[in-house]
């Protein structure tokens, strides 16, 4: 398995995987997520692929077939009155094809993101995970992540 930057040719597979992630969210919180949709359009993906601020890494097999991805966002705080200056690599989305889960592809992607964050001089790697996605929460805890802050809600 090779981890590389995503390219335009990967967009169809990224779209397919985005549908998989969205389905998990829509099934868990149909009051928030629209059924049968995805997070990004092809046009939005094309823009993200061109930006150094939003690196997308893909795990590909020996046939260059995209088995998973990690969408990232480089963030930097500088000169804030209350927060320390710091660089962050935020994982916006991490997905492994549901047919290939359990093969450590997610771990490879996560470790690649960590290595890139270190190379970029980041203080930490952050992400959000929906409480409905317990397998993802367990995976991230196994990777050594711990809660930074918690968003709470009261449905009215």
Show the residue positions of the predicted features.
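A short beta-loop-alpha structural element at the N-terminal edge
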Residues: 2-16, 25
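Conserved GNAT-fold acetyl-CoA-binding loop/helix
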Residues: 23-45
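A short helix-loop-beta-strand connector motif used in the catalytic cores of GNAT acetyltransferases and
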Residues: 43-58
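Conserved beta-strand in the GNAT
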Residues: 58, 65-73, 90, 95
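Conserved acetyl-CoA-binding loop-helix of GNAT-fold acetyltransferases
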Residues: 93-96, 102-115, 142
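Conserved GNAT acetyl-CoA-binding A-motif
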Residues: 118-128
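Conserved beta-strand-loop-alpha-helix junction that forms the acyl-donor binding cleft
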Residues: 126-136, 153-156
């Amino acid at each position: 398995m090779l981890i590389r930057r995503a390219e335009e040719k990967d967009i169809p597979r990224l779209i397919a995987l985005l549908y998989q992630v969205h389905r998990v969210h829509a099934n868990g919180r149909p009051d928030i997520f629209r059924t049968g949709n995805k997070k990004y359009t092809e046009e939005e993906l094309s823009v993200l692929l061109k930006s150094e601020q939003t690196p997308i890494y893909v795990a590909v097999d020996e046939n260059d077939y995209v088995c998973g991805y990690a969408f990232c966002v480089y963030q930097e705080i500088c000169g804030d009155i209350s927060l320390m200056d710091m660089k962050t690599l935020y994982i916006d989305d991490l997905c492994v094809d549901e047919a290939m889960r359990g093969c450590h592809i997610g771990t490879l992607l996560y470790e690649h993101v960590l290595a890139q964050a270190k190379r970029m001089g980041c203080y930490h790697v952050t992400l959000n995970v929906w409480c409905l996605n317990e397998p993802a929460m367990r995976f991230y805890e196994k990777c050594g992540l711990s809660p930074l802050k918690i968003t709470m809600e009261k449905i009215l």
